[in-house]
Design a protein with these regions (language model features):
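Phosphate-end processing signature that detects enzymes handling 5′-triphosphorylated RNA
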Residues: 1-172
Length: 172
């Protein structure tokens, strides 16, 4: 069993782009989606993710907070493509830019398609209270805002958000 401790932030500006170490292309969908989670019929999301030439099945506890149970299993690329195309209710595509800052790797997710325009920074920590650098481009924390969870972006894509929601000013 693994515990993922992850924090998510909006960005002030594009200054992070000058520090990009590498960029990956991700395509992901959910076998258990936001409707099942919201109704209480499921206690975990089940995600299929393709990242460049690799693929995983991911199971993540539905509870909120920055620490959640998470399990990742490598799967054949062909299986992932078939699941994404045939079994998922929508797919999210994004570019993930890895930006190292003082020994910490920030993952900047730049969403595509109906979520184009949404850019968030994520980082994984070893403990909930672990210190981390706060570069000038790092904005408001949205770790506890359900609106920003990837599983929600399929049913409620960024292109449908109001100006207040896009600014992170409206409760989720």
């Amino acid at each position: 069993m693994g515990i993922e401790i992850e924090r998510k932030f909006l960005l002030h500006d594009d200054a992070w782009r000058s520090g990009v170490m590498r960029t990956l292309h991700l395509r992901q969908g959910y076998l258990i989606d936001v409707a099942a989670l919201a109704s209480g019929l499921a206690r975990a999301s089940v995600r299929v993710r393709r990242q460049d030439d690799q693929a995983w099945l991911n199971i993540k506890a539905a509870r909120t907070g920055i620490a959640r149970d998470e399990y990742d299993y490598a799967i054949p690329l062909a299986d992932a493509e078939r699941m994404l195309d045939a079994l998922c209710n929508g797919v999210i595509e994004k570019r993930r830019h890895v930006v190292p800052v003082e020994g910490v790797h920030f993952e900047i997710d730049e969403f595509l398609g109906s979520n184009a325009g949404l850019i968030v920074a994520e980082l994984e920590l070893s403990a909930e209270d672990a210190p981390f650098p706060r570069p000038s481009w790092l904005g408001r924390e949205v770790s506890d805002r359900l609106r920003y969870f990837n599983v929600n972006l399929i049913a409620h894509p960024y292109c449908t958000w109001s100006a207040a929601e896009r600014a992170g000013d409206e409760a989720c």
